[in-house]
């Protein structure tokens, strides 16, 4: 048995963990974590298009951060102005950058996937050209534990309710003369920024076909963990392990398809067995208008 495909496990886990945190920020801002999928697609578009235009990897990551932030602001503003259902509105708006990413991926060869040495990795080490360089020489992967700790620390200081509608609800974070909507959008942008390192990791790990719908998988982990950071990160290990085992399914008929669908089936099982209370429809009308009520 070849163990090389399983080396993708830390990358898959890191990317899903970052997306779980992003979903928590969207949920605590009073919006739906379904919008994280649009943030991931926007970040991937920013990295790919930015590198095509500039040839500088880190500058393209800044472009990706801007693209993810713009999507968060635009989608949050539209959902707020039209008083749309956060889940339906976020899902519908996410289809726009996701479709654009699919069209770009099919438009031809992109520079980011064919540069030698690979951009975004530290070169000049003994791991150059080996399978281990994506683990040892990847600044994004090495920085992931720090980013997750920072995100968890920020959420730890905003413990009001399952969702937070605004960081301003915490007196320690209140900005004088600020409106709750502006604070909600600021939290939304902060959540969108966590998708940038996740997008960078996924583009490096899956250069031939950038993955989609992982934001939905991360949301399932967040919901099943009862909206906790570390619980969601631990639950993300299961789908990440299955995703890293996908190459083993090419040896038998329909194996690849089964392993491709299996992470989402596992996420569904998470929801069924671990979050029955979260999925139970509330009988009171307040549940439809108050984001702190599930």
Language model features by range: what are they?
Residues 3-8, 58, 130-141, 224, ...:
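Interfacial loop-to-helix junctions that mark the boundaries of transmembrane helices
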Residues 4-8, 155, 191-222, 253-257, ...:
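Inter-helical junctions in multi-pass inner-membrane proteins, predominant
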Residues 4-53, 57-61, 65, 69-87, ...:
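Single transmembrane alpha-helix segments in multi-pass membrane proteins
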Residues 19-20, 44-48, 98-102, 143-154, ...:
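Hydrophobic core segments of alpha-helical transmembrane domains in multi-pass membrane transport
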Residues 77-106, 115-118, 210-222, 238-275:
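Pore- or pathway-lining transmembrane helices of multi-pass membrane proteins that form conduits
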Residues 97-157, 255, 287-294:
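Transmembrane helix-bundle core of multi-pass membrane transporters
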Residues 134-207, 229-234:
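Helix-loop-helix "hairpin" substructures at the membrane interface of multi-pass membrane proteins
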Residues 151, 159, 169-178, 246-294:
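Cytosolic-side transmembrane-helix boundaries in multi-pass membrane proteins
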């Amino acid at each position: 048995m070849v163990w090389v495909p399983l080396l993708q496990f830390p990358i898959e886990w890191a990317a899903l963990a970052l997306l779980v945190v992003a979903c928590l920020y969207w949920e605590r801002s009073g919006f739906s974590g379904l919008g994280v999928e649009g943030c991931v697609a926007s970040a991937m578009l920013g990295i790919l298009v930015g590198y095509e235009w500039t040839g500088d990897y880190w500058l393209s990551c800044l472009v990706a951060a801007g693209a993810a932030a713009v999507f968060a602001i635009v989608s949050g503003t539209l959902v707020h102005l039209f008083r749309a259902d956060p889940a339906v509105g976020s899902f519908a708006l996410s289809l726009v950058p996701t479709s654009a990413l699919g069209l770009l991926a099919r438009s031809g060869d992109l520079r980011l996937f064919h540069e030698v040495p690979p951009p975004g990795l530290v070169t000049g080490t003994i791991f150059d050209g080996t399978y281990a360089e994506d683990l040892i020489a990847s600044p994004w992967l090495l920085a992931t534990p720090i980013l997750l700790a920072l995100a968890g620390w920020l959420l730890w200081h905003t413990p009001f309710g399952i969702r937070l509608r605004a960081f301003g609800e915490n007196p320690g974070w209140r900005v004088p003369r600020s409106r709750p909507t502006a604070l909600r959008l600021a939290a939304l942008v902060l959540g969108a920024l966590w998708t940038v390192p996740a997008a960078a990791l996924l583009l490096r790990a899956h250069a031939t076909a950038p993955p989609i719908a992982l934001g939905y998988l991360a949301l399932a982990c967040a919901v099943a963990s009862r909206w906790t950071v570390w619980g969601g990160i631990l639950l993300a290990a299961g789908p990440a392990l299955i995703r890293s085992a996908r190459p083993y399914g090419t040896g038998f008929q329909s194996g690849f398809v089964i392993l491709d669908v299996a992470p989402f089936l596992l996420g569904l099982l998470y929801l069924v067995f671990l979050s029955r209370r979260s999925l139970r429809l509330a009988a009171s009308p307040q549940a439809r208008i108050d984001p702190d009520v599930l």
